Amino acid sequence: MQNPKPLVIVLLGPTASGKTDLAIQIAKKIKVSIHNIDSRQLYKGMNIGTAKPTIEQQEEIKHYLLDLKDPNNPITLHEFKKEAELSLKNIFSKEKCGFLVGGSGLYLKSLTSGLCPPSVPAQEKLRKEFRRLGQKECHQILKKCDPIAWEKISPRDSIRTIRALEVFYSTGQTISSLKTLKPPDWNLLELGLDPRNLQQRIAKRTKILFQKGLIDETKALIHQYGEDLPLLQTIGYKEACTVIKGEYSITEAIEITTQRTNQFAKKQRTWFRRQHNPKWLNEKNSLEEALSLIQNVIG
């Protein structure tokens, strides 16, 4: 008799939708740990700007896939997938199911749909050369060698741009052509959280991040890794850098961060509706609805 397939529950949604709080409530009720699927929370020292679960929250419920690397040592999608699958395999032997929580669409897809990114190791010499050229030039080079990846990668996203170029110059093949799908042998339950007042939630959370010390956190990252750290170009940190340099006031930085976060949330919503098929939870009774759906699957 074959062993039943393990169950993996996913809670996905755009940034600031309330995933972390709901996930902790769910995890407490069904007695499982949480695997965070957030591309920036993988890095040490990036706590406030990424709204990483607090120490208190991590003490309440065990969290995995946090603080895997230093910010100056980018993790590839292949490395993340390997780490996450190994962690889930260990969880399946101890808990009733795996529980993935996050809003990083490509990272989620690598696990839930079995997206297999190329296993090309980091090429530090190439990366240094690409950084010397600058993001604008690199993105134009990408347009010529991998138009498909160029269309999908934001002109501001230096990490993914450099990775795509790294794969091309290392293998002679585009990162787009090397990605394949190998669905995992799991039963999957995807739950979605997308509150109607998301813009208000984003505005409120952005103010809180700055109040909690985002500028000091950014100063610490600059001190340790230098102001050219690519992750300092991401939402929140880039705006904090402008305050540190005296280019913008805190009020202006908060306003710009809010705008960029809203734009990002819009992209997340589009991705989730095209790439996933979750059961969208009613925001008024999301916990009860989630537990009911989970119970129907667990039995």
Curated annotation (Swiss-Prot):
InterPro entries: Dimethylallyltransferase, IPT, P-loop_NTPase
Region span, Interaction with substrate tRNA: 38-41
EC number annotated for this UniProt entry: 2.5.1.75
GO BP field: tRNA modification
Keyword entries, A-Z: ATP-binding, Magnesium, Nucleotide-binding, Transferase, tRNA processing
Domain of life: Bacteria
Binding locations of substrate: T15, A16, S17, G18, K19, T20
Keyword Zinc found: no
Recorded catalytic activity of this chain's protein: adenosine(37) in tRNA + dimethylallyl diphosphate = N(6)-dimethylallyladenosine(37) in tRNA + diphosphate
Record-level Gene Ontology MF annotations: ATP binding; tRNA dimethylallyltransferase activity
Subunit and partners: Monomer.
Protein family per UniProt: Belongs to the IPP transferase family.
Role: Catalyzes the transfer of a dimethylallyl group onto the adenine at position 37 in tRNAs that read codons beginning with uridine, leading to the formation of N6-(dimethylallyl)adenosine (i(6)A).
NCBIfam families noted in UniProt: miaA (TIGR00174)
Name used for this protein in its record: tRNA dimethylallyltransferase
Species name: Prochlorococcus marinus (strain SARG / CCMP1375 / SS120)
